[in-house]
Amino acid sequence: MQKKFEDCVKTILEIIGENPNREGLIKTPNRVFKAYEFLTSGYTQNVKEILNDALFESSNNEMVLVRDIEFYSLCEHHLLPFFGRAHVAYIPNKKVVGLSKIPRLVEVFARRLQIQEQLTEQIAQALMENVDAKGVGVVIEARHMCVEMRGVQKANSTTTTSALRGIFLKNEKTREEFFSLINSAKQVRF
């Protein structure tokens, strides 16, 4: 598999007019393989294992928000990076999940070929199903290199997506609290 991948990278280099055997490019196919192996490692990770190992009984029924989770992903259309921050909240239903597992959940889905809309939905759905939360809210703000480097070439533009489940979708006050906490948190830095 690795050799096939590296051969493809060599072919790409040749097609664009480069010499894959020149000094600066000799190890490039291997480097690209390792980079893509890491950037797509989410395909080999199991969401249930990550979350179920860190579920704890709790009487808490208030919103839990982990914000400003930095992520990097690859656009499935152009294989170019998009990156930004995810804000993930849930309301427990007799169980809470370890706080470090929420960024891990974001990473599992971000380290796949993605579109931002799908990434947002997958995070929300996985948290809702695996934690049995009363509700989940996810907002992602990201910059897309396929927009900034090619096509319309609009540098520094951001895309915002949201996914709401359960009480976040049904209850306006819960939804307002979620969006308010995300926005007010932008003003506070430790």
Curated annotation (Swiss-Prot):
Its EC number is 3.5.4.16. InterPro entries: GTP-CH-I_C/QueF, GTP-CH-I_N, GTP_CycHdrlase_I, GTP_CycHdrlase_I_CS, GTP_CycHdrlase_I_dom. PROSITE patterns: GTP_CYCLOHYDROL_1_1. Homomer. It catalyses: GTP + H2O = 7,8-dihydroneopterin 3'-triphosphate + formate + H(+). The gene is folE. Zn(2+) binds at C75, H78, C146. This is GTP cyclohydrolase 1. Pfam families: GTP_cyclohydroI. One of its GO terms (cellular component) is cytoplasm. GO terms for biological process: one-carbon metabolic process; tetrahydrobiopterin biosynthetic process; tetrahydrofolate biosynthetic process. One of its GO terms (molecular function) is GTP binding. Coiled coil: none annotated. Keywords: GTP-binding, Hydrolase, Metal-binding, Nucleotide-binding, One-carbon metabolism, Zinc. Pathway: Cofactor biosynthesis; 7,8-dihydroneopterin triphosphate biosynthesis; 7,8-dihydroneopterin triphosphate from GTP: step 1/1. Belongs to the GTP cyclohydrolase I family. Transmembrane segments: none annotated.
